[in-house]
Structure formats: C-alpha cells, structure tokens
Design a protein with these regions (language model features):
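Basic, helix-initiating cap at the start of DNA-binding domains
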Residues: 1-28, 32-44, 58
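C-terminal peripheral helix-coil segments that are non-catalytic and often amphipathic
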Residues: 1-4, 95-98, 133-146, 163-165, ...
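Short hydrophobic/aromatic patch on the recognition helix
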Residues: 42-53
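DNA major-groove recognition helix of helix-turn-helix
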Residues: 53, 64, 166
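Alpha-helical DNA-contacting segments of helix-turn-helix folds
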Residues: 59-67
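Hydrophobic alpha-helical connector segments
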Residues: 62, 73-105, 158-162, 184
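Amphipathic alpha-helical segments used for helix-helix packing
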Residues: 100-123
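Amphipathic alpha-helical packing segments from all-alpha helical-bundle domains
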Residues: 119-148, 156-160
C-alpha cells in the first residue's frame, strides 16, 4: 500500500471548522454563536459541520483542547528550565495562567458572561483535568519517584486541583481582581508545603 502524503483531509476540515468557530466566538460571543454561524464562516453546509461536531459545546471543548496542546511543548520546555520541583510547580502554574490570559479563546471563556458555560463544559467533560494531567502528570510522577514529593499523593487528584487553581486565577485576573504575584505567593506558601515529604 502506498504511503500517504499530504495532510489528512478530515483533519483539514476540522481545523477549518474550529478556526471559523473561534472567529464567531470572538465576534458574537460564545453563548450567542450558532452552528449556522459557524457553517457560514467556514463556507460549509451545516450538515458538514454537524458531521464533524455534534453541537456547539463539542466545538468549544475541542477548541480549548487544540489551543492547550499547541502550548504543551513550550510549556514543558519552560518547566524543565527550573531545577527543583518546587520551582517547577510555582513557575509552571503561573506561566500557564499567563498563557491563558493571553489566549483570546480562554479570555472569552473566563469572562463573566461565559463563565457559567465554561465551568460546566470544562468540569463536566473532564477536559480541563485531562489537559492538566497531560502536562503535569509525567513531571509529578518523576518527582514522586525521586522522592521529591510525597509518595502517598494521588497525582490525578493533584492535577485536578492544579486545574481548578489555574481556572480560578485566570478568572480573577481577567476580571481585574488579584495579582499574579500574590497568586504565586499563595502557591509557594500553601500548595508546595502540602506536597513535600515530611522533614523537607
């Protein structure tokens, strides 16, 4: 069988739809965007859009996931620069918050008008925790195996907590309350000591 060349057409169509959806979200707002709006922006029929995405909610979730995964490699490289797990957690979480604040899609999701929908989608779908685990679980597992964090910590639960902390901080900073430096200090003061082995 001949080797396949070029891009996967299905992937190209999905990307086109997602790009169109994101432009509609920015133009109309997430809750007011319809599948018809997306189809029109993508220059496709609604039937084609529905063939790839069952509803607007699945579009939102995949958009968030796509953008997060594009940031995964640079995020890992940034975290790896720090010599200790304490610094990796503090600086890595703060960097993720900063990236979220710069991302127009995340910026929309955590705005007051969209926050209820965002919380429902990302929490109910488990996507926020899944994405946080993709980034953090290998780093945390390595630290746990090296004895740098407690052996009894449930890493899945810890990733869930990190996800919630990041979403909360992005929401607060996006709303004009709090500061990243104060958030950094809270992580250093409360999160880090809870993870370290006794005696550290």
């Amino acid at each position: 069988m001949a080797a396949r060349t070029g891009n996967d057409p299905a992937t190209d169509v999905r990307t086109t739809i997602l790009t169109a959806a994101e432009s509609c979200f920015e133009r109309f707002g997430i809750t007011k965007t319809t599948m018809e709006d997306v189809a029109r922006a993508a220059d496709m029929s609604r039937a084609t859009v529905y063939r790839y995405f069952s509803d607007r909610e699945s579009l939102i979730i995949e958009s968030v996931a796509r953008r997060a995964r594009l940031n995964m490699t640079p995020a890992r490289a940034f975290i790896a620069k720090w010599p200790t797990i304490e610094e990796r957690l503090v600086e890595g979480i703060c960097q993720n918050v900063e990236s979220g604040l710069r991302d127009p899609m995340v910026h929309l999701l955590v705005s007051p008008s969209e926050m209820t929908l965002a919380n429902s989608l990302l929490t109910t779908s488990g996507k926020a925790v899944e994405l946080t685990s993709e980034l953090w679980e290998p780093i945390l597992r390595e630290a746990q195996e090296a004895g740098d964090i407690r052996a009894d910590i449930d890493l899945t639960l810890l990733c869930e907590w990190i996800s919630e902390l990041e979403i909360m901080c992005i929401s607060q900073l996006n709303g004009g309350t709090g500061s990243l430096e104060r958030f950094r200090e809270k992580i250093r003061t409360f999160l880090i000591p809870s993870l370290l082995p006794a005696g550290d």
